[in-house]
């Protein structure tokens, strides 16, 4: 539940910055990332928390479908936005910015189109959650063969082709962004090492402190992403290959899947001075 106030604080800070025309492309991506993480927590974390405290959440087929649909789309956008943030940060701290300037401007110009395209892609891919979701009370999900089990609902596919086809698309998409994150992380580590060596040899030569701080923040997000979503994807592939479905795998997926959306806002707040200043200002007014 700590992710809700954290993501709301990020959204409020960046919404204010956008209204004041005082924002950067990285902050736009961070704001959208906070929105995606907030939707993940509201559709996955809140029901689980209520269930842990003994509050029964009554779901029917419609509410299961809508909840899982919003969750899956938001989770996919969270992955995409994190990878985009890493790639954009690599362009910003490139040792030869003149060579990357044209690519950077091209990405900035196409950023809205890229966002819309990814939204449409994920809305289409995740539509199976709308059509085939049902509550646990409607069927014994653990005994069904072609089933993806969530904590309060499940998705029962009508055919092997749709089951494995949809799973393959999900795994391929997640693995693509995992590879992209790994490459971005490796490049950022390489730049940090090169910068450290240059600082030892030429103390007067240094990169802007704000760029280093922002890059380290993104590096932390990438590492958190690789840990949480990487393990989640592993459990997802096990879920596809194991029948009947084990609830332990579903619980493990839930835990690793929720870590990133809940903890990443704390890292963003601790490393972003604009958000810290906004929070101090709000507390001072009170």
Q: Where are these predicted regions, by residue range?
A:
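Transmembrane helical core of 7TM receptor-like proteins
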Residues: 1-286
């Amino acid at each position: 539940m700590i992710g809700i106030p954290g993501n709301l604080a990020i959204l409020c800070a960046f919404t204010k910055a956008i209204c004041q025309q005082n924002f950067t492309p990285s902050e736009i991506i961070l704001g959208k990332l906070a929105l995606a993480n907030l939707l993940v927590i509201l559709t996955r974390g809140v029901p689980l928390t209520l269930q842990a405290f003994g509050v029964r959440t009554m779901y029917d087929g419609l509410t299961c479908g809508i909840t899982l649909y919003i969750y899956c789309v938001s989770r996919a956008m969270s992955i995409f936005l994190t990878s985009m943030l890493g790639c954009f940060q690599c362009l910003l701290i490139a040792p030869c910015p003149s060579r990357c300037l044209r690519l950077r401007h091209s990405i900035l110009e196409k950023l809205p189109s890229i966002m819309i395209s990814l939204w449409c892609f994920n809305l289409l891919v995740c539509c199976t959650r709308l059509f085939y979701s049902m509550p646990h009370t409607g069927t014994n999900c653990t005994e069904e063969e072609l089933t993806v089990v969530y904590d309060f609902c499940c998705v029962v596919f009508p055919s092997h082709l749709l089951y494995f086809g949809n799973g393959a698309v999900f795994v391929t998409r997640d693995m693509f962004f995992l590879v992209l994150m790994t490459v971005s992380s490796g490049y950022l580590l390489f730049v940090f090492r090169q910068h450290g060596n240059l600082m030892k040899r030429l103390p007067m030569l240094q990169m802007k402190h704000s760029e280093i701080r922002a890059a380290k923040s993104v590096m932390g997000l990438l590492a958190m992403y690789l840990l949480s979503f990487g393990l989640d994807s592993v459990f997802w592939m096990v879920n596809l290959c194991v029948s009947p479905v084990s609830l332990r795998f579903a619980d493990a997926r839930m835990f690793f899947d929720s870590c990133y959306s809940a903890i990443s806002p704390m890292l963003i707040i601790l490393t972003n001075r604009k958000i810290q200043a906004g929070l101090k200002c709000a507390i001072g007014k009170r």
